[in-house]
Amino acid sequence: SFGEKGYIDKVSHTIPEFYKELATNPIHPQTSQPVPGDFKRQYQFLSSHYKSILSIHIPNSVSGTMQSAQTAVKRVSGSSVTILDSLNISVGQGLIVTHAARMVKAGKSHDEIVEGINYARENTKVFCCIKDLSYGVKGGRVPGSVKVIADILRISPILTTSSNGKLEKAGAVLGKKNLGKKMVKYMKNKHDVSK
């Protein structure tokens, strides 16, 4: 939401509309998790069409979304819903969900898919480089002093998720230009990319 104006991600506000408002609205957007009732309705609908449901979420450490889903499952009778923590955010979660979808398409059983998701989340690691900390400061997640120091030293922090799903600093690169190339170099230097 931007102040009093609320939106449902990619439903009532397209991605280009969001970024346009982000650039022009002086109010910083805030997110909120879906309420258990939203999950309950989805689970009831899906239960009427499928034998089992896999619900894959971003970690509890960064959002209460999974907790809302767990609360909703307790209110849905006669369904087989498995709530899974992806231990990843953004692209990492998307890769895990895509892996699960491929397993469904391949005809794997519910238990085989859960096992595959657990394997995928243990082997999925995403790194991102933050060019500008302004939105982190506006959202209250980054102290203003950290942004000032990063700007003065021209440092771009690299973030990742820990093994328990918490967002953490992985490193940093110098400069604000050619971050893609710098990230590739960072990955080659710090991590065995041959696996």
Predicted segments with their positions:
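Mixed-charge interfacial surface used for oligomerization/domain docking
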Residues: 1-5, 61-82, 88-98, 102-195
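N-terminal glycine-rich anion-binding loop in soluble enzyme alpha/beta folds
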Residues: 1-33
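Short catalytic-loop micro-motif centered on adjacent basic/acidic residues
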Residues: 30, 55, 83
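Glycine-rich, highly charged phosphate/nucleotide-binding loops
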Residues: 31-42
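Glycine-rich phosphate/diphosphate-binding loops that line cofactor/substrate pockets in enzymes
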Residues: 40-51, 186-194
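Short, glycine-/small-residue-enriched flexible loop/hinge segments at domain edges that mediate gating
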Residues: 52-61
